[in-house]
Structure formats: C-alpha cells, structure tokens
C-alpha cells in the first residue's frame, strides 16, 4: 500500500492535533510535518492545575514516582555558605525539559518555589525539613505582581536560621514572621541599622530599593545577620555616670625657676615687633621670668611690643615710675606676686600701659575708677616733673574744653602707630610720618582742603585698645626729609602736626560707630590712614572731646624720654663701630 493511499484513508480531523491548525494541504505537504515545531502534543487526562494557581499544588501527586526524595538532594555549595541561590528547577515529569525554571520571571508563589505543573518545588532543604505544609497557609501566594522582582532569589538555610525566605517577601503582617530564625534576623538587622532591639519592620527602607519591596533589606540580613549571642546593644550612659567618673589629673607644669605652673601662667607671646629691633636691628633684650615677680610695684605688661625692653629698664627709670604711681595718694600696700601675674594672664595679647596708666583700664578696655587716677584734663603730675613735658604744656593747650567738633568742612583719618615711643616723639617734636602709601593719601587730602578746613588725625597704637589723642595736620608731606627720631629707621618723609587732645579713650566708647566706607566695620577696627566720613567723624570727635579721661601718655613721659636716650646712645655706638 502506498503512502498516498494511507493519507487518503486517514480520517478527517486527524490532520492536525491543534484545534486552530490549518485544515488545507499546501503543495503536497502535510501539516503533520510541522507538528514538532508548532506546538507540544496535547496529553489527555491532564488534570493538573495551571501555573498561576499557587494554592492547591500540594494536593496533587507527582506524575512520575521517584525512588528518592528531591528534598534530600545533596547540596552543591560544599558547606553553609551564606550566598543567594536562584529558585528551584521543576522536577522531571514525563519527558518535560528539566531546565525550565518554575518561577524565574515574576510568577507568584510562596518561598520562591511556585510549583511547576502541580509538582512540589525543589526546596534545597535537608531531609526531615519539609515546607509542603506551608502551601495551605495564607502566606502562600501572597507575593503580588506589583513586586518588581518577585521570587527572584532565595537564600541558603544556614544564613537564615533554617528558613528559606523569599528575596522579595515583606516581613510585616505576614505569617513568615513566625518562621524559625526570624528573631535572629530581626535582632541582626536592628543591630546593623539602629543598634537597638527594634524589629526590622520599623527600619526605614533603603533608598533605591525595587518598587517598595524589601529586597535590599533582605539581602543585608542574609549576609550580615549575626546570632543573638553576639549582639551586644550599647550600654546607655547618663550624665550622672559621666559626672561620677573621676577626672584625670593633669601633671603640674613647672617653670625654669621651679614655680608651679598653676601659680605662674606662661609669659605672653613675644612677637618680632619690639621697638628698636625692626628687621633684627638693634639690641634684643630678653626679660627673665623672675622680672615679673620682682617688679611688684609695677603694673604688668601684656603688650608684645614692650615686654622685652621695658622689663629690663635701668633702676632710675623704675624709681621714677614708682614716684608716678604714688603721687596722688599715699602708696598702697604692695600686691602679692601671684596677683600681679594673674592680672597679666587675664589679657595675654592686649596692650597694657607700662606704668601708672595700667591701673586706669579694666580687663574689658573700659576705664576704671580705682585709686591713683589723674585729674581730668591733664595727666598725673610726677613728683619731679620732666622739664620737656613742662615746656610742652606751657606752649600747647592740650585737651581744650572749647573744641569745635561740629565741622562744616574738613577731613578725618585714623592713624595706627606701632608703638607709643613714636607717639611720644610726635608730641615732643610736633611731626609725624606714615608709610609711603599713607603719606600720599594724607598729602592729597591736605592739598585738597587748601585751607578750607582742618585735617584731623585720630591716633591709636596697635593692640592698645584705646585712642591716645587727636592731632591736626599742619603742612604737606615733605618726601625728601627723614626725621631720624623714630624708633624704627624705615620711615621716610615728614609733615608737621599740632596735638590737640592727649588722652586715653577706650575703644568701648567708640565701637558703636561704624564706617560705611570700610565694610560697615567699627571705627575701632580700622587700618592706618583709613578716612572717616565727616558725619561719623563728628561723633568720634565729640566723644573724645567730652570724655573724662583718667590716663594719658603723659603719665609715662619720663619713661619714654629715658628709652629715647638709650636708643640714641645705641645708635652712636653703632656709628662709632662703623667708622
């Protein structure tokens, strides 16, 4: 019998086993030739549930019986390695391909093992641990399709305390929380995240997790969870516990003379701004630490400009200073050395007057009201007044009461001096000299006024904390003349001035006045030759003119006279050596 006759005798309807298949033959080809490629063969009596049905798979038996349980399959990882595993493969059933994953791409199912064609999932558990009973509880199939990567990963039992937890399952409000080892996971997660005993459901989700799922949290738990025995919550510490601990005793520092560091603070920092030592020129006198204790009758020095040289003054100068201190009232009892040193340490970086003027200032730069104050309008008169000072007072009317501070025309500048030595010599010789830039600015201002108004200069020593006087510029700058009287040889040029006020006015009296042309800074925070606007200058001049001062540089005039004589003798010795 030929093949064609067999085809003719074949009953109708058997040409294609697929219901929707073609019924027409084309070009002598039979549709049966394409059956292996078009669709799998339909098996009769297939009573298995669909793949999406994840509720009743445990009620059906496998289609093929095996002599061993797949749950007893040997582990291929060689130990309890805490690493994620892909979900299980489907069991071999009637020639079906065994490599098809049952829940790889978003199929719902509990514990990442949705059964394939009604078969039990491969659960990676050793014998005796069977989770088939879990298929009946409400937790099975609770993973919704909204989960971005549902049932993608599962974890080894060793890393989760014996329970295989779906990588995307949410721990809150599910019966999976009842699984063995969940306390360990919660405690480990709490120790990892918060360091407390809160449950993992209270931990905020990590930014970047997949569509509101707990996969990242589960991954962290699987790789970092620790047994409860190793979790040690931090011991709470209260302020009472901290206060009850004894303080560590600091070793007492001792000076070169063996005096305890608690009674003698360290001396002030010595900068390279000493008078007569500019650019390492002139003698550099170092004051021994004993000088602070021996000079009890002298107020302490806090200025880095005067500590080195004024501590080594000759005895006549020291005697003269004592006379200035005790002139207005009987001499007070000598102060202890420790009190004198404490006064110095209170202002280690502030300038303090070298003699009697130190008692006129408080620690905050405000004038004090203690004993030994001079009368308003003049400095304290020494027991033996210096003849140069007497001559200056007879010629000049310092601190006039009828000063006209309400200027209609005029310009006012701030002058910052490196030392009071130069202030003393400016008063003595009625001259002044600024930097090259400052001289040009002052000279231009003086020439611009052309006699229409005064040019006032407000003097202040760097770091002194007060203004020491006001002078009027009386001539243009002579750039070709060098006065040769300044404590430093760096100044070139000179111009004449007339001193009007010689008094110490603390910065606290003027700090509220701010300059709009200097970043709105206080007038006390100005640089050399900083111009003060006229309206603000009127306020400054009014305060200086009306301030009842208690100290001035006249109190130390004899001291600075002696210093000038010493400097001149040193210069003569240098000139003699140079010849």
Swiss-Prot record:
By its UniProt entry, which InterPro entries does this protein fall under? YTH_domain (IPR007275), YTH_prot (IPR045168)
Please give the residue ranges the record annotates as the region Interaction with m6A-containing mRNAs. 385-579
PTM section of the record: Ubiquitinated by the SCF(SKP2) complex, leading to its degradation.
Where is the YTH domain positioned along the sequence?
Answer: 410-544
Q: Where is this region: Localization to mRNA processing bodies (P-bodies)?
A: 2-384
Q: Which UniProt keywords apply?
A: Acetylation, Cell cycle, Cell division, Cytoplasm, Differentiation, Immunity, Innate immunity, Mitosis, Nucleus, Oogenesis, Phosphoprotein, RNA-binding, Spermatogenesis, Ubl conjugation
Instruction: State one molecular function term (GO).
Output: C5-methylcytidine-containing RNA reader activity
Record field: compositional bias (Gly residues): 359-371
Low complexity bias: where? 337-349
Residue ranges annotated as compositionally biased, kind Polar residues, are 291-316, 372-383
Q: Does the keyword Zinc apply?
A: no
- Where, by residue number, does RNA bind? 416-418, 422, 432-433, 462, 486, 491
Q: Which residues carry this modification: Phosphoserine?
A: 2, 4-5, 22, 39, 196, 359, 394
Tell me the compartments it is located in.
Cytoplasm, Cytosol; Cytoplasm, P-body; Cytoplasm, Stress granule; Nucleus
Query: A Pfam family name for this chain?
Result: YTH
Subunit structure, per the record?
A: Interacts with CNOT1; interaction is direct and promotes recruitment of the CCR4-NOT complex. Interacts with YTHDF3. Interacts with RIDA/HRSP12; interaction leads to recruitment of the ribonuclease P/MRP complex.
* Job of this protein: Specifically recognizes and binds N6-methyladenosine (m6A)-containing RNAs, and regulates their stability. M6A is a modification present at internal sites of mRNAs and some non-coding RNAs and plays a role in mRNA stability and processing. Acts as a regulator of mRNA stability by promoting degradation of m6A-containing mRNAs via interaction with the CCR4-NOT and ribonuclease P/MRP complexes, depending on the context. The YTHDF paralogs (YTHDF1, YTHDF2 and YTHDF3) share m6A-containing mRNAs targets and act redundantly to mediate mRNA degradation and cellular differentiation.
The Swiss-Prot or TrEMBL record describes its family as follows: Belongs to the YTHDF family. YTHDF2 subfamily.
> Can you say what this protein is called?
YTH domain-containing family protein 2
Lineage per the UniProt record: Eukaryota, Metazoa, Chordata, Craniata, Vertebrata
């Amino acid at each position: 019998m030929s093949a064609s006759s067999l085809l003719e005798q074949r009953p109708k309807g058997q040409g294609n086993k697929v219901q929707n298949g073609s019924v027409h033959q084309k070009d002598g080809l039979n549709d049966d030739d394409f059956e292996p490629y078009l669709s799998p063969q339909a098996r009769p009596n297939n009573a298995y549930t669909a793949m999406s049905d994840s509720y009743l798979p445990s009620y059906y038996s496998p289609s093929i019986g095996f002599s061993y349980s797949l749950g007893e399959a040997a582990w291929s990882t060689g130990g309890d390695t805490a690493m994620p595993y892909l979900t299980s493969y489907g069991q071999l059933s009637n020639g079906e391909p065994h490599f098809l994953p049952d829940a790889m791409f978003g199929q719902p199912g509990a514990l990442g093992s949705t059964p394939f064609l009604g078969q039990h999932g491969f659960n990676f558990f050793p014998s005796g641990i069977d989770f088939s009973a879990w298929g009946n509880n409400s937790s099975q199939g609770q993973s919704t399709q909204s989960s971005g990567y549902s049932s993608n990963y599962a974890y080894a039992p060793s890393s989760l305390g014996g329970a295989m937890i779906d990588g995307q399952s949410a721990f809150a409000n599910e019966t999976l929380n009842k699984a063995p080892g969940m306390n360990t996971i919660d405690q480990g997660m709490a120790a990892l995240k918060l360091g407390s005993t809160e449950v993992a459901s209270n931990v905020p989700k990590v930014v970047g997790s997949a569509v509101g799922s707990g996969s990242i949290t589960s991954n962290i738990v699987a790789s970092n969870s620790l047994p409860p025995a190793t979790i040690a919550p931090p011991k709470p510490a209260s302020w009472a516990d901290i206060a009850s601990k004894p303080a560590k005793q600091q070793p007492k520092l001792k000076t070169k003379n063996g005096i305890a560091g608690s009674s003698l603070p360290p001396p002030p920092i010595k900068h390279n701004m000493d008078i007569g030592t500019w650019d390492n020129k002139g003698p550099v006198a170092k004051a021994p630490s004993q000088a602070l204790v021996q000079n009890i009758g002298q107020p302490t020095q806090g200025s880095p400009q005067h500590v080195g040289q004024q501590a080594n003054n000759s005895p006549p100068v020291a005697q003269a200073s004592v006379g200035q201190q005790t002139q207005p009232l009987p001499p007070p009892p000598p102060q202890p050395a420790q009190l004198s040193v404490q006064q110095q340490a209170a202002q280690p970086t502030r300038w303090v007057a070298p003699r009697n003027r130190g008692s006129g200032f408080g620690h905050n730069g405000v004038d004090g009201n203690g004993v030994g104050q001079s009368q308003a309008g003049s400095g304290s008169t020494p027991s033996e007044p210096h003849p140069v000072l007497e001559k200056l007072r007879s010629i000049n009317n310092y601190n006039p009461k009828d000063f006209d501070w309400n200027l209609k025309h005029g310009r006012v500048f701030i002058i910052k001096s490196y030392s009071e030595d130069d202030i003393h010599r400016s008063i003595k010789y009625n001259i002044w000299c600024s930097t090259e830039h400052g001289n040009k600015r002052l000279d231009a201002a003086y020439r611009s006024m052309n006699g229409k108004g005064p040019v006032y200069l407000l003097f202040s020593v760097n770091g002194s904390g007060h203004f020491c006087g006001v002078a009027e510029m009386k001539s243009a700058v002579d750039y070709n003349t060098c006065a040769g009287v300044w404590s430093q040889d760096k100044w070139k040029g000179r111009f004449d001035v007339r001193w009007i006020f010689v008094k110490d006015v603390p910065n606290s009296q003027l700090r509220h006045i701010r300059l709009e042309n200097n970043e709105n800074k206080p007038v006390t925070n100005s640089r050399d030759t900083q111009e003060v606007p006229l309206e603000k200058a009127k306020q400054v001049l009014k305060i200086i003119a009306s301030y009842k001062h208690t100290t001035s540089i006249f109190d130390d005039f004899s001291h600075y006279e002696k210093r000038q004589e010493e400097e001149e003798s040193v210069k003569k010795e240098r000139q003699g050596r140079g010849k």
